[in-house]
Amino acid sequence: MAQYHQQHEMKQTMAETQYVTAPPPMGYPVMMKDSPQTVQPPHEGQSKGSGGFLRGCLAAMCCCCVLDCVF
């Protein structure tokens, strides 16, 4: 009977403890509760139809042709 009371008390104290986590690595962005939310500017990328994919394919084909002629 004494063993039952010891196990019951141990389970109760384990449930009441707070869990602690490790701090994030250095340089990792951390959001503070008191700091205001920062608004990031919109991403300025290339517009559609700029031909990036087509230019890359043509450059690859030219490289293949040059390598074919050389070897």
From Swiss-Prot:
Membrane topology reported for the UniProt record: Single-pass membrane protein
Result of knocking out the encoding gene: Increased tolerance to high salinity with reduced reactive oxygen species (ROS) levels and associated with an over-activation of nuclear salt stress-responsive genes.
Free-text tissue specificity from the UniProt record: Mostly expressed in leaves and flowers and, to a lower extent, in stems, siliques, shoots and roots.
Any single Pfam family the record assigns to this protein: CYSTM
Entry superkingdom: Eukaryota
Transmembrane segment boundaries: 48-64
GO biological process, one term: regulation of reactive oxygen species biosynthetic process
Localization terms from the record: Cell membrane; Cytoplasm; Mitochondrion
Annotated region (Disordered), positions in chain: 30-49
Keyword annotations from UniProtKB, A to Z: Cell membrane, Cytoplasm, Membrane, Mitochondrion, Transmembrane, Transmembrane helix
InterPro entries with a match to the protein in the record: CYSTM_dom (IPR028144), WIH1-like (IPR044850)
Induction, as annotated: Induced by salt, cold and drought.
Any GO CC annotation of this UniProt entry: mitochondrion
Family: Belongs to the CYSTM1 family.
Protein task: Negatively regulates salt stress responses and Na(+) homeostasis. Prevents Na(+) efflux, disturbs reactive oxygen species (ROS) homeostasis, and represses the expression of nuclear salt stress-responsive genes. Involved in resistance to abiotic stress.
Complex formation: Heterodimers. Interacts with CYSTM7 and WIH1/CYSTM13.
Descriptive protein name: Protein CYSTEINE-RICH TRANSMEMBRANE MODULE 3
Gene name for this UniProt entry: CYSTM3
